[in-house]
Every structure is written in structure tokens, then in C-alpha cells.
Swiss-Prot record:
Lineage: Viruses, Riboviria, Orthornavirae, Pisuviricota, Stelpaviricetes
Gene (UniProt): ORF1
Name recorded for this polypeptide: Non-structural polyprotein 1AB
Biological-process GO terms, alphabetical: DNA-templated transcription; proteolysis; viral RNA genome replication; viral translational frameshifting
Domain called RdRp catalytic: residue spans: 1160-1286
Positions where O-(5'-phospho-RNA)-tyrosine occurs in the chain: 693
Compositionally biased spans, kind Basic and acidic residues: 783-795
Disordered as annotated region, ranges: 753-813
Site residues by UniProt (Cleavage): 175-176, 419-420, 664-665, 755-756, 912-913
Provenance organism: Human astrovirus-4
């Protein structure tokens, strides 16, 4: 490259010449040598930009220019690079639209070339495979042994000749001897001649007189058939006479005998059958029955035919009894063999009985032979002629089908006559817009789409699982991204920029489904069809035959407005799913609290309606789950049943529509609320997560959860009907609430936006016994003055414990004040300033979705501050929060702390600066020299002291006055448990969890066993392959937790910290670590308040919990949250049960899974100090296994971040409440982000090691092994157990891993019954029984936390009743809970809680409803 000439990297780059030529002239060989890896033979854009715009500076170099290159990289991304004098540095991409379009086409061309190359390679490989298979076929044909010609044995020829001779002699017949010689009876011959002459004379007379009758003609035909005109001594008469005499049997038998000897595979049996058939006299009738026989039944038939020769009555009796005896005595056979034997016996019975009847009546069995032969021929007639003929073209494609049946001309005539009636109307024209259609192309196939708004709409099944699809429009191909797929079979695709000027289809505001038009592309041709439609809930049906490529086509009315999206065809009717404006935007799922409140109101409305009208029923539509799996016969059957069910539903709706004018409607009645589809009922969710389940064992369920549970039960009571009668369908049902029949709505009374409220109010508790009269709530008019607002506030009850109100039509929370109370308060200048965050704290989503509304609100705030008039703020903030909630964003009122309810938190001193408590290693600047050792044991280092104000003593044992309502217990086993209390000695004792025995270097000592354990772990968790690292702002964790030191000095919870500073510190610290810094994280240690044995409390044996800085925890969530979520989704098939629910048959399903393995041994394993004694080498190894599942690119990119994260897990700087700082280097910390998941993987890895230790690395035997784990809980089934298993396995874990298993904690049985898992013992029906009911009773009578009210106590008792569902009826714990419920129910008659759960409700919760029943 000559100096001063523009530089071009390739010919396309020179042809396009994007950017500045001056910048190209500045390129030097050094700059060219260090160019980034752009796509080969692709253009780049060169810019000549002022240096100060790229590198901020105030010096003289600000106006110097630098070269910026923009292009496409080999990894498929788009980037810009600036040369800083030494190397190219990546900067924020500069958009060049022409370059981006060119790169897109180049990428597509390269992809197509790669696909072509791979296809050609695959074609060549397949062609080579075909040649190999052809050669192999020829070679194998040569190896096939050729059948040798059968050798005829002389003995069978002799036997056949003897049997044939015996059968042909006159004595071979079972009849008396008769002289059948010809010309011996001369008198009869003469008499016959005279009669013949007389008949001929009479016939000639009649012919002469022309007096021939029909009877004479029939006699003539009969004489011809009887050879009357053939001379008596003619050879033809002699041949036919002898053939008739022998009935062709002897000749046929002789031929069969020769053929049997020559070709039969069992000549002896066949010859004996011929002989017995001749001996018995059945002859030809035997032959058609032989194919029905097996070898056994054939010998039975031969025996009975021989018996018939001697005693026919005995043979008939045995033949009739043979099928009956065979049905009884041959039942041990398999089905196919059993049916064959019975069929042969029945054929024998028919032959013997029928043959005897024929011989008795006619003297021959010819009629029986004809009947059997006719039946067989009719049975085989379907083989000769098919049901239809298929006409194919040269390529083998079927172009036409012709039925083989003969058309009924008369039927077709009347059908056409009926259809071609007199024209009674004129068809209307319809509007179509072909320019609004496009073709959606995916690797799985093609579909039709249409432009509407800013999206391309099509069917979801046409898109499949693809994130990007190709949009074909007017011969051009565009790549587009799938934006959103709702629950319906609809997909919304982002419209490419080049296609925005195209025509658009609008949605119909007033749908008319009487006549619909379907437009679609089929084989690049536009097809249009018009038909009448029927509405079935959210779908349409119409008589249109669906062709390939029509999925996703618009279904429009006569004005060209979209009604629905064409979906499918089930044989006779086309189907479409109705589309409405709400489908275009994803709706944020309501929170758990909102769902609970909504369902409480629905339940109460349903109960009120049921009380007024007992016939009212609530129908819950079943949830249809589509899974991608292999298709089996049962799947095909289910698919056909679903299609037929849909067709019958369509037919039923059409018939009901025809009969509607003739049906009478009862006056004075309305069916609103009966059987209506409850669209807002919660569907298919687990009753309890693992966190709630753990809490349930200690504290029970609260009132909200229990009411939600009751609502679920009532919603599932009518689980069997699957249809929706149109009598119960209400088109005006908007899903906001359900009320009784006679409730009249006043739509102007109160405006309630509960569905989109940003800050849900808590549930109300039990109202006062005598509530004071309340003023009627009026709607809030935001245009009124401040005085009227104050007057309105006086009308609305603002108590933190509101009085009980009657449920309103649009209210979702029982007795809840209107949502306006959250916004209608005395606004001041501080409220106005802090309602909106600073512009730099707004997220990208806020700016895109709410940009205009935020600007509007800022203007209103500025005006309000200037005029000191804040009356317009409530409405403006409410509208902003409403728009935010509809877009799935958090409301702004929720983002700030309410002045009335917020806690005054201490802020950081001004002279410290933000860095002192934002950074992960801020604690180091506050570290002081060590002081007195108080809570740190002597074998742990004392690194220093930090200023902290936390207690190290806790001797509180709460006394709950509500427990005075409960009866005195007679069972005192619970007294050995109690709430934990501690002093400094408990902190020292808690460090003992890390010590039991020293592990060896098992990776070096047992490499083969470790390799087997690794193989088993990778095989078990293979579904984690290609998991991803997520952004820190997308992580989820409990924000109501301590933010650790030093943030805990200024904020009580992480939620307070987030509200004060947002995500900026999190992103800053993550970037800091990503750039290479390795700050040392500080963990905060505290003891757990729980119910344990009194002996442990006296010994100060309390569990310690450590928690790290929330920024560090969320960095761990970035690395492992995706894997943790997948583990929770695979509890049914994987070993880890984190996320598992024992409710709705979950417990029994898991136990049945272990039983179905068919192993003889079941093992319950209980560890001691499990997570504290995990060897650091093993813990680090498990973390490496998990990291190997991460996507390769991200695995390399964030490798150093992961190493830093694991290093801070293994080497923990720990702060105690006494201010002492120490170092922990053992175990799995109980407060890290993935404690349970890591414990699960360690548990499984150690089991695989243990299996190989006792059985060797046998991979095939390991596949019969199965286990379920939850942290340190373990229940497994194994095909073999060595002798002295308990002693040997305890020694193995102690000597190799240094882990502690106490004697008696390893239980091995030949049945799973009696073993326990997660606090439940398995009973005979594989159902759960609480393992330690005395501990549950202690948490009731000796709690570590006081319950807030009597409703919470009653809810806790209901929870214990649920846990004791499968306990013995006379168990003291179950009896005591029932006694307590009777006490508390008397005090809570108006609370809305049930007095107790019925047996049916308990079984529904544990086993599931009629659609989910598992046991």
C-alpha cells in the first residue's frame, strides 16, 4: 500500500467505499497489521472523528482526529474500533445503515454458502454410504444358504400308496355294499327308453301345435343338464357318471396324497388327516377347516374323526365339549397362542356336529363343504379389491383418489337436487388486502403472516421455538425477531424497518362472525375463501379446507377487519383463534399477594352465590400443556380424540344455534355466574415451594395462604366437565370479579384499578365485633380543590386495620379501601421532588415506554413547586404508575419510601464518601487491631475488630397469650424441644461444624472412582449444558435480608439500599471485578432462631448462618441463577428436589419413582454437620463441574470472575456480632446463593463415589441406581448392598472425606415403607407422615416468635391438620390439633376461615383433583 493512498481490505470494501476517504488515507502498515478480525470479504466504514469525542480530554489534543473503523466481526456482532496509537480499542458502535444492510446480506450469503457446503458434504457422505450398503447387500446375499431340494423318502411313498389303495376299494366305504355295475338292470333300461320316447313324442306334438309353456322350457333345460339327449352308451355319460359316483373325492384324495408326499413339511400328519377324513365320511368338508387348526387341535380333530367311525354320538359330545374345556384348561397360554387353540377347537366342533347333520339329512357333506368354503371366500374378498384407487404422477405424488364402491346414482341425484335450490339471496362483496400478507419461513416449514400495527402477526405453531424467522414479502427475504407469544396460538414478530411502509390490517372494533374471509399464501399463490363461522369461546370454526402454509392467515370480516388468526384444521372444519387488542402486549403477571386477594374475593362471591342458588357451579377449564416429545400410539389416539371432541363441540354449537329460536327461556331468571369460565383462577401452580415447605414445618401457613388453598380446592371441585355450555357464557364478563345473580352494578360508584395497581394493600384481618357506621365511599374527583379532597379523606377510613365492608363488584380485597388512598395524601415539596428519580437512575425501559409521561410529570412537578399547588400531582402520578404497571414496570410510588411509614435510617457520614460502604472491600478501611477473643474459638485466627453494635446474648423465650385458649396437652413428648437461646459460648461451639476428621487427597488416591463420579454427575445434570450468565439487574433474591457489613450500619435491608442507590453500585462493582480486581468480601455471622432439642440448647449447639454483601451474592446469582432455575424445573426426573412440592401427589410420585426401579434395597442416609465437613477440594471441584456447563464463550469470558467468586466462598473473612473478624476455610457457607444446589451436587457425587467404591465403576449397573436428595437429605434405591454396609460406609466417609455419619443413621431395608425424606416418613400407600410430630407440637406450644392474632393461630392449626392428614386417627398429636381447632373455631366464626378442613379437602390438597390425581 503506497503512502497517501486509501486503504481497502477487500474488493467489496473498495466497491462500497463506506465512510471517509481521508480516514482510509491515514491507515499505516502498523494499523493494518493490528486490525480486528472483521468478516472476510466484507466492507467497513471509516470515520475521521475528533479525538475529544472519543477520549474525553481538556488538553491540546482535543481537536486531533483519530481513525474509527466500523464493521462486522467474525462472531456475528457489529462493532466500532478506534486506534489510540498502540492498538485498536472497541468503543460504542457507530450506526451506518448502509453498512449494516450490506453486512446483513453478506452474513446471510455466508450462512447460505455454509449450509450449501454442509449439504453437499452430507450428500456425498450419504452417496458413499449407499454404495457401501449396496456392496454389503450383495455380499450378504451370497452368504445366504440356498435351500436344498427335498429328498423324497420311499417310506412315505409306500404309506401313501397303501392308504390310497385302501381308500379306493369298495370296502373302504362306511356304507353297505351296493351293486353299481352298468347294464345289469335291463328292465329299468328299457323302461327308461320307453319313457324317453313318450316324452319326446309329447314334446313334438306341442311344438306342432305351438302350445309350449314355461314348464316345458324348464323341463327341456333340465334334460339338457341331465344328458337326456346324449346316447345311453356314449363315453361322456359314462365319465360323468363315475365322477358323480365317486363325488370327485377319490381322485382328489389321490392327488393330495401325492402332493403331500412331495411338498408337505409334515407329511405324516397330513396323510393321517386325509385317511381319517375318508374313514369318517366327512371327506371334502375337512379340507377348508385345516388352516384354522394348530398342531394340537389338528390331532384332536383326527382323534375325534376316528372316534366318529366307531361311535358318532361320543365323538359329537366330545367335539362340543372341546372348546369349553379348552377355554378353561388353556388359559395359561399367552393371548395369541390361546386364541389360535380355541379357534381350532371351535372349527373341530363345527365340523363334527355339522358333518353328522349333513350325513344324516342328505347322506353327503358337500353342503357343509360349500358353506365353509363360501365363508372363507367372503372373508378374503377384501384382499382382492381395496377401498379406493390412487392415481399418482411420475414423482409418485397422489393426484386423485377414486373409490372402488359403485356410486349410488339415485342418492347422488337427490343430493344434488336438494343442494341446487332456488336462489333466495345475493352474496356480498368482501374487502381483501393482499399487500398486507407475507410468508413466514422457518426451518420447520412455512406459514402465513399479516401486518398489523408495528408487528407481523402469525400462528405460534408456525413459529415454533425459533427466536428469529424469515419474512418473505414480494420476493424479498427479511430477518425478523419474534417479539411476544401470548397464551393463545398467536405470535407477534417485530416488523423489519424496510417493511413499515406496507399495508396494514386493522382489528375489528365490532366483530361480526356471520361471514368470514380467509386469505393466505399457498405455494406462492394467494388463496381466498369465504364461509360462515361459529364462535366457540375464544375460537372460530368454519367450513374451509386447510392447506399447507395457511397457518397464521388473517380471518377478516366483509370490511377487511381482522377477527382471528387461522390456526388449524381437524378434518371437517377450519379453526381460528380470536385476537383482540390486549393480545398485542404482554401483561405483567400479578404478584402472589394480588392473586391471593383476588381469589379471596372470588371465593366469597361464589359462596354468597352458592348460598342463594345451590345449583350454581363453578367450572374450571383444564390447562392444556404442550410438550415436545416423541410421538407414540397413545399420543396419536389422544390427538384423534381431541380432534373428534372439537368436531363434536362445533356440531353441538351449530345445532344449538339452529334450535335457539325454538327454545323457551325462563322469565325472571338469569344464569350470570353459573358455570362461567373463571379466567383469573390460578392454574397449574405448585401449592408449596421448598422454601414455603420448610417454613410450613416450623411455623405453618398464614391466613392468606390458607384462603388461597381453599380457593384452589373450590375451583377444582368441578374438574370433570370439559365443555362450556353457551347458556353459561357471558360475553360481558370482563374477568374482574364474580358476583351473585341478583347483584346490580353501579358503574359510576367507585373507579377501582386493582388489576393494575402498583402497590397492593395487605389483607384485612378480622373486623371488630361492633363496627362503627361508615360513610359511603364516593368516587374521587381529582379536579376538585384541596378542601374537597380533605373532605373526601375524612369520608374514607384510613385506619391501618380497616373495618369490614361488603365486597364490591370490582373489588379484589375484602374490606380494602380504594386504591386512591395510596395517592391521595397531603403532597408537599419533598414528595414532589422525590417521586421521580434522577434522569441517570432511570432504566432504558423507563425511557422507552414512559418517556413522554415522565416529561409531562416533571413539568407538572415544576409548576406545582412554583405555585405551591399540588392538587394535580395525585392524578398525574397515578396515571404514570398505571402505565408503568401495564408495561410490566415497577410503579414510581413503590420505588420511593413513604414518609408516613418509612423508618428513619442512619445515613453515611458526609466525610466518608460513598465508596466507604459501596465497595466490596470497604470493611478493610474500618478494620481495627484485634481485641479480646470472646466468640472466636482458639483454633481460628483473629484478624481484627470492626465497630458494630449487635448483641451476643439471646435468652428470650416468647410467651404467647393466645396459647391460653388452647387445652392442656396430655402428650408431653414435645417438652424435649424448645426455641434456641445462646451466649458467647454458642458462637464458639458453632465452629465445631467444620471439624470431624481430616480428608485425604482422594483425587490422587482414587482417580478411577473420582472419574466415575464425575461421569455420573455430568450424566445426571446434562440438562445444564449451555447455560448462561445473566445480567446483574436481572437477578432475583430476597431483598428483605440484611445487607451485611458495613451497609447494615445504614440500611436495615437490601431493599432499603436498592431504593436509596439503585443498581449503580452493583454494576460498578461487577465491572470492577470483571476488569481484574479481586476484592476480599466480608461475611456476617449470626445464629439461627429455631426449634431444636433442649439438650442441644443446654450444650450451646446452635447452627450458624453467614451472609455476604448483597452485591457479592448477586454476582453469584449472575453466574448460577440460570442453572438453579433449571434444577428446580427438573425435580421429576433429576435427583435434586429443590423446588419440589410434596402436595398434589408430588410426594407419592417421587416415592413411586424409586419403587419403579425394581431394586431390592432402599437406603435412608442422615448426615451430621454435612455442609460444614464438605472437603474444600470436593466443593471446589463441584463448582468447576457447574462452570463447565456454562456456554463456552461466556465460560471463557467470565472465567476470572468465577474464580474470584469461588475463592471468596472457600476463604471467607467472617464478622461476628462481637466485632471480631476471623477466617473460615472449610465447608459450604449456609448463606451463599446456591447453598442447597451445591449440597445436592456434592451429595450425588459422593453417592456415585460410594457406589463405585463398593461395586466398582460399573456404568451399566449404575443405571439401575436412583436417588433423591435435598441438601443433606438422601433417599436412594440400589440393586446391591455389601455385607456390613453401615459400618463400611461410615468408615469410608470418615477416612476418605472426613465427613461424619453417626451409627444408626444409615437405614437399609428391602421396602421403602418406614423410611423418611424431608421430614416425612413413607407409609404403606407411599403417602407422607410427619417424622417428628413432637417438634411440630413444640413449635405450636413453645414458639420462638409470637403470633400476631388469633386468625394466625387458627391458620397454623389448620396447617398442622393438613400435615397430620395421613397419621393414625388416635395419634395424640392429631387428636390434640382437632381439639385445638374446635376451641379456636368458636372464636372465629366470622373470619372467613373454615373451622377445619374436611377429609375430601385434605385428600385434594395432598393427592390433587380429579384431573391431577396421583394416588
Amino acid at each position: 500500500m503506497a503512502h497517501g493512498e486509501p486503504y481497502y481490505s477487500s474488493k467489496p470494501d473498495k466497491d462500497f467505499n463506506f465512510g471517509s476517504t481521508m480516514a482510509r488515507r491515514q491507515m499505516t502498515p502498523t494499523m493494518v497489521a493490528k486490525l480486528p478480525n472483521f468478516v472476510r470479504n466484507s466492507p467497513q466504514a471509516y470515520d475521521w472523528i475528533v479525538r475529544g469525542l472519543i477520549f474525553p480530554t481538556t488538553g491540546k489534543t482535543y481537536f486531533q482526529r483519530v481513525v474509527v473503523i466500523t464493521g462486522g466481526l467474525e462472531d456475528g456482532t457489529y462493532g466500532s474500533f478506534v486506534f489510540d496509537g498502540r492498538e485498536w480499542v472497541e468503543i460504542y458502535p457507530i450506526e451506518h445503515l448502509n453498512l449494516m444492510s450490506s453486512l446483513k446480506l453478506i452474513h446471510k450469503a455466508n450462512a447460505l454458502q455454509e449450509r450449501l457446503r454442509l449439504s453437499q458434504e452430507e450428500k456425498a457422505t450419504l452417496a458413499l454410504d449407499v454404495q457401501f450398503l449396496q456392496h454389503e447387500n450383495v455380499r450378504l446375499k451370497e452368504l445366504i444358504p440356498k435351500p436344498e431340494p427335498r429328498k423324497i423318502q420311499m417310506k412315505w411313498i409306500i404309506v401313501g400308496a397303501v392308504l390310497t389303495f385302501l381308500s379306493l376299494i369298495p370296502g373302504g366305504y362306511a356304507q353297505s355294499q351296493i351293486n353299481n355295475t352298468i347294464f345289469t338292470d335291463m328292465i329299468a333300461a328299457c323302461k327308461y327308453s320307453t319313457e324317453t320316447l313318450t316324452e319326446n313324442l309329447d314334446l313334438r306334438i306341442k311344438l306342432a301345435l305351438a302350445n309350449i309353456t314355461i314348464s316345458d322350457k324348464l323341463d327341456a333345460v333340465r334334460q339338457i343338464l341331465n344328458f337326456a339327449f346324449v346316447p345311453r352308451a356314449h363315453w361322456l355319460r359314462t365319465v360323468f357318471y363315475y365322477i358323480h359316483y365317486y363325488e370327485m373325492w377319490n381322485i382328489f384324495m389321490f392327488v393330495l396324497a401325492i402332493g403331500t408326499v412331495m411338498r408337505s413339511a409334515r407329511p405324516g400328519t397330513d396323510l393321517i388327516t386325509l385317511a381319517t377324513s375318508h374313514l369318517s365320511g366327512f371327506r371334502m368338508a375337512v379340507l377348508p377347516t385345516i388352516p384354522f387348526h394348530t398342531t394340537m387341535t389338528l390331532w384332536v380333530m383326527n382323534t375325534l374323526m376316528v372316534c366318529y367311525y366307531f361311535d358318532n354320538l361320543l365323538a359329537i359330545t366330545l367335539a362340543i365339549l372341546a372348546p369349553i374345556l379348552g377355554i378353561i384348561f388353556l388359559c395359561f397360554m399367552e393371548d395369541s397362542n390361546y386364541v389360535s387353540q380355541i379357534r381350532g377347537l371351535i372349527a373341530t366342533a363345527v365340523l363334527i356336529a355339522g358333518g353328522h347333520a349333513c350325513l344324516t339329512l342328505t347322506g353327503t357333506t358337500t353342503s357343509l363343504f360349500v358353506v365353509i368354503l363360501t365363508c372363507r371366500f367372503i372373508r378374503m374378498a377384501t384382499v382382492f379389491i381395496g377401498t379406493r384407487f390412487e392415481i399418482r404422477d411420475a414423482n409418485g405424488k397422489v393426484v386423485a383418489t377414486v373409490p372402488t364402491r359403485i356410486k349410488n346414482v339415485a342418492f347422488d341425484f337427490f343430493q344434488k337436487l336438494k343442494q341446487s335450490g332456488v336462489r333466495v339471496g345475493v352474496n356480498e362483496f368482501v374487502v381483501i388486502k393482499p399487500g398486507a400478507l407475507c410468508v413466514i419461513d422457518t426451518p420447520e416449514g412455512k406459514g402465513t403472516g399479516f401486518f398489523s400495527g408495528n408487528d407481523i402477526v402469525t400462528a405460534a405453531h408456525a413459529v415454533g421455538n425459533n427466536t428469529f424467522v424469515n419474512v418473505c414479502y414480494e420476493g424479498l427475504m427479511y430477518e425478523a425477531k419474534v417479539r411476544y407469544m401470548p397464551e393463545k396460538d398467536i405470535a407477534f414478530i417485530t416488523c423489519p424497518g424496510d417493511l413499515h411502509p406496507t399495508a396494514r390490517l386493522k382489528l375489528s372494533k365490532n366483530p361480526d362472525y356471520s361471514c368470514v374471509t380467509v386469505m393466505a399464501y399457498v405455494n406462492e399463490d394467494l388463496v381466498v375463501s369465504t364461509a360462515a363461522a361459529m364462535v366457540h369461546g375464544n375460537t372460530l370454526s368454519y367450513a374451509v379446507r386447510t392447506q399447507d402454509g395457511m397457518s397464521g392467515a388473517p380471518v377478516c370480516d366483509k370490511y377487511g377487519r381482522v377477527l382471528a388468526v387461522h390456526q388449524t384444521n381437524t378434518g371437517y372444519t377450519g379453526g381460528a383463534v380470536i385476537i383482540d387488542p390486549t393480545d398485542f402486549h404482554p401483561v405483567k403477571a400479578p404478584s402472589r399477594v394480588e392473586l391471593l386477594k383476588e381469589e379471596i374475593e372470588r371465593l366469597k362471591a361464589q359462596l354468597n352465590s352458592a348460598a342463594e342458588n345451590p345449583a350454581t357451579a363453578v367450572t374450571q377449564q383444564p390447562v392444556v400443556t404442550l410438550e415436545q416429545k416423541s410421538v407414540s400410539d397413545s399420543d396419536v389416539v389422544d390427538l384423534v380424540r381431541t380432534a373428534m371432541e372439537r368436531e363434536m363441540k362445533v356440531l353441538r354449537d351449530e345445532i344449538n344455534g339452529i334450535l335457539a329460536p325454538f327454545l323457551q327461556k325462563k322469565k325472571g331468571k338469569t344464569k350470570h355466574g353459573r358455570g362461567r369460565v373463571r379466567r383469573n383462577l390460578r392454574k397449574g401452580v405448585k401449592l408449596l415451594t421448598e422454601e414455603e415447605y420448610r417454613e410450613l414445618l416450623e411455623k405453618g401457613l398464614d391466613r392468606e395462604t390458607f384462603l388461597d388453598l381453599i380457593d384452589r380446592i373450590i375451583g377444582e371441585r368441578s374438574g370433570y366437565p370439559d365443555y362450556d355450555d353457551e347458556d353459561y357464557y357471558d360475553e360481558d364478563d370482563d374477568g374482574w370479579g364474580v358476583v351473585g345473580d341478583d347483584v346490580e352494578f353501579d358503574y359510576t360508584e367507585v373507579i377501582n384499578f386493582d388489576q393494575a395497581k402498583p402497590t397492593p394493600a395487605p389483607r384485612t384481618v378480622k373486623p371488630k365485633t361492633c363496627p362503627e357506621p361508615e360513610a359511603e365511599t364516593q368516587p374521587l374527583d381529582l379536579s376538585q380543590k384541596k378542601e374537597k379532597q380533605l373532605e373526601h379523606e375524612q369520608q374514607v377510613v384510613k385506619s391501618t386495620k380497616p373495618q369490614k365492608n361488603e365486597p364490591q363488584p370490582y373489588s379484589q380485597t375484602y374490606g380494602k379501601a380504594p386504591i386512591w388512598e395510596s395517592y391521595d395524601f397531603d403532597w408537599d415539596e419533598d414528595d414532589a421532588k422525590f417521586i421521580l428519580p434522577a434522569p441517570h437512575r432511570l432504566t432504558k425501559a423507563d425511557e422507552i415506554v414512559l418517556g413522554s409521561k415522565i416529561v409531562k410529570l416533571r413539568t407538572i412537578i415544576e409548576t406545582a413547586i412554583k405555585t405551591q399547588n399540588y392538587s394535580a400531582l395525585p392524578e398525574a402520578v397515578f396515571e404514570l404508575d398505571k402505565a408503568a404497571y401495564e408495561a410490566g414496570l415497577e410503579g414510581f410510588l413503590q420505588r420511593v419510601k413513604s414518609k408516613k411509614g418509612s423508618k428513619k435510617l442512619q445515613r453515611a457520614p458526609e466525610d466518608q464518601g460513598a465508596q466507604n460502604y459501596h465497595s466490596l472491600d470497604a470493611w478493610k478501611s474500618l478494620l481495627e487491631p484485634p481485641r479480646e477473643r470472646r466468640c472466636v474459638p482458639a483454633n481460628f485466627p483473629l484478624l481484627g475488630h470492626l465497630p458494630i453494635n449487635r448483641p451476643i446474648f439471646d435468652d428470650k423465650k416468647p410467651r404467647d397469650d393466645l396459647l391460653g385458649l388452647l387445652p392442656e396437652p396430655t402428650w408431653h413428648a414435645f417438652e424435649e424441644y424448645g426455641p434456641t437461646t445462646w451466649g458467647p459460648q454458642a458462637f464458639i461451639k458453632s465452629f465445631d461444624k467444620f471439624f470431624y476428621a481430616e480428608p485425604i487427597d482422594f483425587f490422587s488416591e482414587y482417580p478411577q472412582l473420582c472419574a466415575f463420579a464425575d461421569w455420573a454427575t455430568y450424566r445426571e445434570f446434562r440438562y445444564l449444558e449451555d447455560t448462561r450468565v445473566i445480567h446483574i439487574t436481572a437477578t432475583e433474591k430476597n431483598t428483605d435480608s440484611t445487607p451485611a457489613y458495613p451497609k447494615m450500619n445504614y440500611f436495615d435491608t437490601e431493599e432499603n439500599y436498592l431504593e436509596a442507590h439503585g443498581w449503580a453500585p452493583y454494576i460498578r462493582e461487577f465491572t470492577r471485578v470483571f476488569k481484574g480486581d479481586k476484592p476480599e468480601v466480608l461475611w456476617y455471622l449470626f445464629l439461627k432462631k429455631e426449634i431444636i432439642k433442649e439438650e442441644k440448647i443446654r450444650n450451646s449447639d446452635i447452627r450458624q448462618i453467614v451472609c455476604a454483601d448483597p452485591i457479592y451474592t448477586r454476582i453469584g446469582a449472575c453466574l448460577e441463577a440460570h442453572q438453579n432455575a433449571l434444577m428446580k424445573q427438573h425435580t421429576d426426573t433429576s435427583v435434586g428436589q429443590c423446588g419440589w412440592s410434596p402436595m398434589e401427589g408430588g410426594f407419592k410420585k417421587t416415592m413411586q419413582r424409586l419403587v419403579n426401579k425394581g431394586n431390592k434395597h432402599f437406603i435412608e442416609f442422615d448426615w451430621t454437620r454435612y455442609d460444614g465437613t464438605i472437603p474444600p477440594a470436593l466443593f471446589k471441584h463441584i463448582k468447576e463441574i457447574r462452570w463447565n456447563f456454562i456456554n463456552k464463550d461466556q465460560r471463557e469470558k467470565y472465567k476470572h470472575v468465577h474464580e474470584w467468586y469461588v475463592d471468596n466462598l472457600l476463604n471467607r473473612h467472617v464478622l461476628l456480632p462481637s466485632g471480631e473478624v476471623t477466617l473460615q476455610t472449610r465447608g459450604n457457607p449456609s448463606g451463599q446463593f446456591s447453598t442447597t444446589m451445591d449440597n445436592n451436587m456434592v451429595n450425588f457425587w459422593s453417592q456415585a463415589f460410594e457406589f463405585a467404591y463398593f461395586n466398582g465403576p460399573d456404568k451399566d449397573l449404575w443405571k439401575t441406581y436412583d436417588t433423591v436428595v435435598y441438601g443433606d437429605d438422601r433417599l436412594s434405591t440400589t440393586p446391591s448392598v455389601p455385607d456390613d454396609y453401615e459400618e463400611r460406609v461410615i468408615n469410608m466417609y470418615r477416612d476418605i472425606f472426613g465427613m461424619w455419619v453417626k451409627p444408626g443413621k444409615v437405614i437399609c431395608r428391602d421396602s421403602i415403607v418406614g423410611l423418611s425424606f424431608c421430614g416425612f416418613t413413607v407409609n404403606e400407600n407411599l403417602e407422607p407422615v410427619p417424622t417428628s410430630p413432637e417438634k411440630l407440637m413444640a413449635s405450636l406450644l413453645k414458639p420462638y416468635k409470637i403470633l400476631p392474632d388469633l386468625e394466625s393461630l387458627h391458620g397454623k392449626l389448620l396447617c398442622y391438620q393438613l400435615l397430620a392428614a395421613f397419621m393414625a386417627e388416635d395419634h395424640p398429636f392429631k387428636v390434640y390439633v382437632e381439639h385445638c381447632l374446635s376451641r379456636t373455631a368458636k372464636q372465629l366464626r366470622d373470619s372467613g376461615l373454615p373451622a377445619r378442613l374436611t377429609e375430601e379437602q385434605l385428600h385434594r390438597i395432598w393427592r390433587g383433583g380429579p384431573k391431577k390425581c396421583d394416588g
